[in-house]
Regions:
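Conserved short alpha-helical segments that host acidic/polar catalytic motifs at enzyme active sites
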Residues: 1-172
Length: 172
């Protein structure tokens, strides 16, 4: 993946060498060999934000009401791992943003994040990149917000689901 990004970056520089102003290249793409998935979130800029990329993992992906979903985490297993340009659920905690100029690797139940260290690498982790370019192209959004969470309502009921009758009997 890193070599592919290097090739594309170098070819783009060569193709644009006579241009006065060159817009950064946004390179979000995924490759797989059938057992491992490698995904990039990359931009040829040290100051701009790349197009957004998020991932979520858990035990299952459940529909809480028609058209609304959430990731369920019943244990520490990561049976479901999703990668998307934008969060697919209204639960902010369901999604983790992949940092700009990073590689996300998924192999079985293991998720690894690695920075791409090249001329566009930003050493300061607190540096705020500009999202203007990605937003102007419609390539960056935000996590959707759901309605306010009711206090004192257990999580399953808050999602519109209920516990099996046997579980309720054991709790009482």
């Amino acid at each position: 993946m890193l070599r592919t990004i290097d090739y594309i970056r170098d070819w783009t520089k060569e193709a644009n060498k006579d241009e006065a102003h060159v817009e950064p290249s946004l390179l979000n793409f995924a490759v797989t060999d059938g057992s491992t998935v490698v995904v990039s979130r990359y931009i040829t800029s040290k100051t701009d934000e790349a197009a957004s990329l998020h991932f979520s993992c858990g035990s299952s992906f459940v529909e809480t009401s028609p058209g609304e979903y959430r990731v369920e985490r019943l244990d520490r297993n990561q049976d479901v791992i999703m990668v998307a340009s934008e969060p697919l659920t209204f639960e902010r905690g369901d999604w983790t943003a992949v940092p700009t100029n990073s590689i996300l690797t998924i192999k079985k139940q293991t998720i690894l994040l690695h920075p791409i260290i090249d001329e566009y690498y930003q050493e300061d982790p607190l540096y705020l990149r500009s999202s203007t370019l990605a937003e102007s192209k419609g390539l960056m959004g935000s996590i959707p917000l759901a309605k306010a969470v009711e206090k004192n309502v257990p999580p399953l009921e808050r999602e519109g689901r209920t516990r099996p009758p046997t579980a309720v009997a054991h709790i009482a």
